[in-house]
Structures are given as structure tokens and as C-alpha cells.
Amino acid sequence: MEHAPFVIPAQARSGPQLRDVLELLKPVTWFPPMWAFMCGVVSSGVPLADRWGLLIAGMMLAGPLVCGNSQAINDWFDRHVDAVNEPQRPIPSGRIPGRLGLYIAIAGSVISLLVGFVIGPVVGAATVVGVAMAWAYSAPPLRFKANGWLGPLVCAGAYEGVSWFTGAAVMAGGMPDARIIWILCMYALGAHGIMVLNDFKAVKGDAQFGVNSLPVQIGERNAAEIACWTMALPQVVVIILLARWGLHWPSAMVAFSLAMQAVLMQRVLAAPAANAPFYNATGTTLYVLGMLTAAFGLAQIA
């Protein structure tokens, strides 16, 4: 699909302000990966006092650097769509002029990689994966965000899986315990469903611009059912694994959380588009609290 030439408003070409760059990096999106990072820190079982400096560096890496950079990448490659849907965003409004948005994305990637490898080789390797996923999600030719199945999976893997792994690796000073990797993979897989629910807020716009989100592809009801099952089944695996490892209380608490989520899911299934925001504020909160519960459990056997 060809786009009309993208013209920067003449009055906005004087150069960006710091607040414009910060808006481009979307600080509100940093919380999920930083939460997952802290789950990784907790799950490692390593006392915080032993690695404070690396802990702070790792939090900056997971949030402002890798996640913030992914937002810059996404805004650059979505600038034509944003010019219609969100013309007030920094790039289409001209507050980030010319190709500066792309240069910020490239610089953010380089800085993220440098910080990752300064922390350690395992963290550096995880950063390579995270940065690669950010570009693959938004940029041609892969542009996974245009695929309703792969887009949420890549986003969930980066936000939850890579961030949790990074937190555990920072504290462990190397490769995390295999049991930690099992749990983070389950929660990353389950977060696919959370990402699908996020797509309900833009169903009309996605259909208009040819974005094949899952609700657009298979209908809202079917997409909601898949999202719910995708969130629930990995948590069942987490419950079983924690119990097998002797972590009965954490297992029971995650099971209780899942039972509460199942009740809330019924409301989503009744009216997916209308009730997805409600679930994101309630069921997703229970989901991420389950992540932290599992992390505290893993710390007992680290």
C-alpha cells in the first residue's frame, strides 16, 4: 500500500523539545516490562543488597531503553497511520521533524545493546533478542504487528519473557535457573491473550487500515475466546509446575487468582469490545500479581 508524501508542518521544524522525545518514548508503556523485570529479580532469590548498581541499570534497560526504544520504532513506522488517527503524536505533528524519529530509534537500539553487554554477556544476548523483536514487530519486511497471531506473541514475548529473563540474569550474573525459564515462558505465552484483548480498542481503525488483528480476522467473540484460553492454560501449567516443585502455597495462590480471572472472563465473553477495558483493569491485574506470586515461590528454591 503506497502512502502520500509525509509532510512536516512548517511551524514545527525548529527542533524537538525534551518533552517531545519523552512523549515519543511513551513512559506509560514502561511499567509492564519493568514489572516483569522485577519478577525476574525476585525469582532469582539473590539479595538485592548484593547487586544494587546492576539492578538499577537493568531496570533502566528494561523500561526507558528497550521498551522506550520499541515505542520510537513503532511510531516511526506507523507515522502515516498516526497522521490520520493520532495527528497530535510527536512525529506526525512535526514536533519530531524529518527523519529524527528514525535516528532516535537507531540510537536507542545501539545504547540498549551497549548497556546490556556492559551488564553481562547473558543480559547482552537477551537485549539483542529484545531489540530484534522490537524492530521485527514494527518494521518491514517482517512487521509482525500486521499479523493478528504473531504480533501479540512477539509483543508478549518481549514485554514479559525477555524482561523477566533479563531481571533474573542480572541478579544471577549469568543464565537463570531452568525452572525460572519455564515459568517466564508460560507467563509470556499467556500474555499473548492480554495483547489480543488490547486490540479490541482499535477494531474499527484496524479494519479500515488493513491491520489484521485477531478480532478483525476471526471476529470479536472468537478472538475473545482465544484470548481467554491463551491466558488461562499457561497459568494451569504454572500451577502444576509450582506444586511439583513443592511450592504448594504459591501454587494455590496462583490457582485462586486464575479462578477469579475465570469469573471475570465471562463478562468479557458476553461483550468483548465493551468489556475488554474492564478486564484489562481487573483480570490483567490478577494475572500480573500471579506472576509476582510465582516469582516469590521460585525464590524459595533458587
Regions found by a protein language model. Name each.
Residues M1-A302:
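Multi-pass alpha-helical membrane architecture of UbiA-family
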